[in-house]
Amino acid sequence: IPAQYSAKNLEEKLVNKKELAERFGLTYSEKIPIIGLISRLYDSKGLDLVQKAFVDLMKMDIQVILLGTGDHKYHSFFEKMASKYPKKFASYLGFNDELAHLIEAGSDLFLMPSKYEPCGLNQMYSLTYGTVPVVRETGGLADTVIKFNEKTEEGNGFVFKKYDSDEMIKELKRALKLFEDKKTWQKIMRAGMKVDFSWDVSAKRYIELYKTILSSE
């Protein structure tokens, strides 16, 4: 990635955002949030929700960058949308590891509206990168993304429960409202960057889980 950054120097993340916008031919603005989406393009990944909500998404003051490959119907849909909304939406319909890293590091938010997701890695990457995830509450997403609570100011992302495009838009709007409050937003970013996904921690959790299961039998 163009610029390394940490929870202590979040400003450097903007260097990656600028590079990302330029790479995809979008006009860079610090104030306009970029929503990243890296996914296999299938219904199970919630792409039908994205398709259904697309016009509403394009009405928001955002830019969306998608990388992925999959179902032909989604390839043709996103190709059409990229030519219809060239200032707001860009896509790379294939896989490219370097671009995937740049999207993770340069986006402000990461969208993962999966129908089901046994584990999910992209939300973990995005948390580590300080790219705030907006996910559906399912499987591994529910385990790793904690819905931000405005009263307690705790949480590391945004979560919607019902598999529904309106619910997804509603939670996205809540995230975008908080994006305008830089202090709160950086708090959410830092909360995600502090999460430890190392195998050591995961292994300990599994061992505890097995002990619990065995002792209850």
Question: Could you describe each region identified by the protein language model?
Answer:
Residues 1-217:
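Catalytic cores of carbohydrate-active enzymes across secretory and cytosolic contexts
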